[in-house]
């Protein structure tokens, strides 16, 4: 029963995480489209010149990188987008930390109940009754604190996370340019970076739930 409940709670959490990154993805897509839209006419003009043989492929790619990848506005865009993704990661970590104490509590209580149910009455009298009560929120949090070595809370190091996301956004843009993506496709590449963050959050949630489940059971002994 505790396994089934834990899995159900994990599915609920994963849905919440999906909503977080879906919203972030929409916002990033809008920012990227607005940014690239400002250069659409210039892009069309330069692309036509490139097609006419006035530029080599490397020269055209260099122009694109100067426009999109290295300019001040491009840097500001990536900084803004990276911070938005880091904000989503912080929200995801908070959701995970909010749920794991309850997973600890239920698995702790269920394990304690199972231990008691398997003990002979004589042994229970010798060692004292094992109380089976649902742990309230405050007790659960205290239990989590005591078990931090087993189950440390999820934390997002903001500056490190922002740097990581900026690098991934830059790489996505570079790959798009090298592969000759249209402006629309360039904007869409940023969604892949959102997907990376979403995947990492799901992985963190599953790891945290497994740790909470095991930690709760161990605490019953």
Features from the language model and the residues they span:
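N-terminal leader/targeting and assembly helices and adjacent pre-domain segments
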Residues: 1-195
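Acidic, glycine-rich two-metal-ion catalytic cores of nucleic acid-processing enzymes
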Residues: 192-221
């Amino acid at each position: 029963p505790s396994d089934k409940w834990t899995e159900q709670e994990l599915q609920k959490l994963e849905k919440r995480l999906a909503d977080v990154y879906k919203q972030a993805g929409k916002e990033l897509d809008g920012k990227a489209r607005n940014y690239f839209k400002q250069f659409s006419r210039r892009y069309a003009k330069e692309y036509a010149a490139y097609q006419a043989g006035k530029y080599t492929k490397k020269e055209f790619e260099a122009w694109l990188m100067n426009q999109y990848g290295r300019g001040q506005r491009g840097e500001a865009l990536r900084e803004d987008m990276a911070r938005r993704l880091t904000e989503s990661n912080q929200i995801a970590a908070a959701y995970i930390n909010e749920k794991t104490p309850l997973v600890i509590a239920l698995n702790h209580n269920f394990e304690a109940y199972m231990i008691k149910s398997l003990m002979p009455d004589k042994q229970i009298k010798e060692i004292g009754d094992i109380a089976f009560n649902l742990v309230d929120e405050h007790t659960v949090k205290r239990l989590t604190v005591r078990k931090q070595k087993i189950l440390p809370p999820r934390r997002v190091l903001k500056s490190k996370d922002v740097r990581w996301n900026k690098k991934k956004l830059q790489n996505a843009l570079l790959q798009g340019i090298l592969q000759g993506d249209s402006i629309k496709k360039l904007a869409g590449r940023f969604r892949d970076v959102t997907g990376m963050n979403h995947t990492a959050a799901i992985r963190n949630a599953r790891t945290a739930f497994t740790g909470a489940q095991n930690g709760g059971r161990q605490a019953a002994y």
